[in-house]
């Protein structure tokens, strides 16, 4: 049998050889990117682990500030209207401390967002999977939570909400919990009723109530149940934190009771909830807390403020040590030992202003080191992948010119396909999704329209292949060129997005933007899989 050789349909001049070589290279790169993306997708669906996944440190041995309250009730309302806290009669007049914050639904699934509220850690640091069913997200999370630090302090906890909180309950040592397997109005009202009975009989130190209200459903029954829960809270000894998260948009936090300074505040982040709650309870912040204490909200003296900030700095020190080691950055907390010791000495000597200022500076420097380690890891991983988008760009440009000269695909539909596939991915990458939270519904229609035009362009090209009087080999060859062209065009923004975001760090996108990016990437994945079909269609080029 003779050796395999490449059959050139139009002679053997070097432009055709070069064009065919580029096609083969693009096919190979497409297969490589498809495999990489498929691995990422499978890992994220199952159990994606960041560099800190094996870090099992806790904050139980860290110091804590003095307790400001005897009990904390944290209520999470999911799916209620954006103005629910302002217009609900059950909440009217009980407090003026309304805190605006970015939505707690800070990842692709609501469960990942609630992890941030109870642990202070982003899903990236919490060890939560990128995607997956809600009942698996909290189960896989490895971050220490308010339940753990409160139980380690010898105090009781209670949880009432959906059954997928079972992983959080299992982590707590002592918990009076009732979990509901179904969502909707009955389960939400039952959770509020169970929490109210517990607060009226033997109130725990920490009570979490999670209500998943149907989007757009009337809230009259919810108002009545919430009114009963509010009446069960004793404001002279307890504090109520109520986070209302609509289906889309900005969440609101209402706080009232002991330890709270009434007023209107802005700038609180979801990651600040856990450290602030820990300061109220007088327990250490969870070990992976990335947020800070929202001090404007708390009614405390100079000693309590200094001790709480110093305790948070100790927890953040351990996190920074593990984070810098996990990210492989050439950064170290060793040079900050002097600042750490100065804060400890100031607390021991009762110099509260000096302790507060030193803890603030230490926290800022530690956070800066972790950000620098993150950026170094991202850019370090981007460098070796820089050739990938360059190869895609060169191959796509060459194939576009070749297809235009051979009239295999009109230029206008091809450009529409580029707009449908590339611009959303690149735009989401550069903006990180922060500017589409309020216009997500309209943006979906734009994506649908552009995607429809791109699909019509591909169908038109296939119709041309069927209409022309070519033999079967010519049709296969031109179909291979068409599929390769579409795969390369759709694969270019995906390659750029993977290069920009990095494979070993978490994708920092809010929920709506993440859903849009996920939809775009899934369509791009379909285009990349079409590259494999192109390889099959190109088989007639190889003859023995």
Model segments located where?
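N-terminal Sec-pathway targeting helices
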Residues: 7-29
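Anion-binding catalytic surfaces of enzymes that hydrolyze or transfer phosphate/sulfate esters
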Residues: 19-23, 32-36, 167-168, 174-230, ...
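Histidine-centered active-site microenvironments of extracellular/periplasmic hydrolases
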Residues: 236, 241-263, 307-308, 433-441
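A post-motif C-terminal structural segment
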Residues: 249-252, 256-294, 298-302, 308-311, ...
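Phosphate/adenylate-binding glycine loop and adjacent helical scaffold
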Residues: 296-387, 456, 490-496
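Alpha-helical transmembrane segments of integral membrane proteins
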Residues: 375-544
């Amino acid at each position: 049998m003779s050796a395999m050789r490449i059959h050139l349909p139009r002679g053997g001049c070097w432009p055709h050889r070069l064009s065919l070589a580029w096609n083969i290279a693009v096919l190979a790169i497409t297969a490589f990117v498809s495999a990489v993306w498929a691995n990422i997708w499978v890992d994220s669906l199952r159990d994606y682990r960041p560099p800190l996944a094996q870090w099992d440190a806790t904050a139980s041995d860290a110091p804590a500030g003095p307790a400001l309250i005897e009990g904390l009730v944290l209520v999470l309302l999911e799916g209620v209207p954006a103005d629910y806290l302002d217009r609900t009669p059950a909440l009217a007049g009980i407090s003026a401390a309304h805190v605006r914050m970015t939505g707690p639904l800070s990842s692709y699934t609501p469960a990942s967002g609630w992890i941030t509220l109870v642990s202070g850690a982003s899903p990236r640091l919490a060890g939560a999977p990128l995607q997956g069913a809600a009942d698996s997200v909290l189960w896989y999370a490895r971050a220490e939570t308010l339940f753990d630090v409160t139980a380690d302090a010898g105090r009781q906890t209670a949880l009432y909400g959906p059954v997928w909180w079972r992983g959080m309950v299992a982590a707590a040592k002592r918990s009076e919990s009732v979990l509901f397997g179904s969502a909707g109005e009955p389960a939400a009202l039952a959770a509020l009723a169970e929490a109210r009975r517990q607060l009226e009989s033997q109130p725990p130190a920490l009570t979490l109530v999670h209500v998943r209200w149907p989007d757009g459903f009337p809230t009259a029954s919810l108002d009545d149940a919430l009114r009963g829960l509010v009446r069960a809270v004793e404001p002279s000894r307890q504090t109520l934190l109520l986070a209302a998260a609509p289906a889309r948009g900005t969440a609101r936090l209402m706080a009232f009771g002991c330890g709270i300074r009434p007023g209107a505040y802005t700038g609180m982040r979801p990651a600040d909830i856990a450290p602030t709650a820990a300061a109220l309870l007088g327990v250490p912040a969870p070990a992976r807390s990335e947020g800070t204490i929202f001090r404007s909200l708390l009614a405390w003296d100079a000693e309590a403020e200094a001790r709480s900030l110093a305790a948070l700095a100790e927890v953040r020190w351990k996190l920074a040590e593990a984070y810098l080691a996990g990210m492989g950055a050439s950064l170290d907390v060793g040079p900050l030992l002097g600042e750490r010791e100065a804060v400890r000495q100031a607390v021991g000597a009762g110099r509260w202003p000096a302790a507060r200022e030193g803890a603030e500076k230490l926290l800022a420097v530690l956070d800066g080191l972790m950000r620098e380690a993150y950026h170094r890891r991202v850019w370090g991983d981007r460098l070796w992948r820089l050739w990938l988008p360059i190869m895609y760009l060169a191959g796509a440009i060459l194939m576009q010119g070749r297809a235009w000269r051979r009239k295999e695909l009109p230029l206008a539909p091809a450009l529409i396909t580029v707009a449908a596939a590339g611009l959303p991915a690149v735009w989401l990458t550069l903006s990180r999704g922060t500017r589409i939270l309020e216009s997500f519904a309209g943006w979906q229609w734009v994506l649908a329209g552009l995607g429809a035009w791109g699909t019509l362009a591909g169908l038109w090209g296939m119709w041309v292949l069927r209409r022309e009087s070519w033999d079967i080999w010519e049709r296969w060859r031109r179909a291979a060129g068409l599929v390769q062209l579409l795969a390369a065009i759709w694969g270019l923004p995906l390659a750029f997005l993977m290069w920009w975001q990095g494979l070993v760090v978490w994708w920092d996108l809010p929920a709506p933007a993440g859903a849009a990016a996920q939809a775009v990437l899934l369509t791009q994945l379909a285009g990349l899989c079409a590259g494999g079909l192109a390889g099959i269609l190109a088989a007639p080029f190889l003859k023995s």
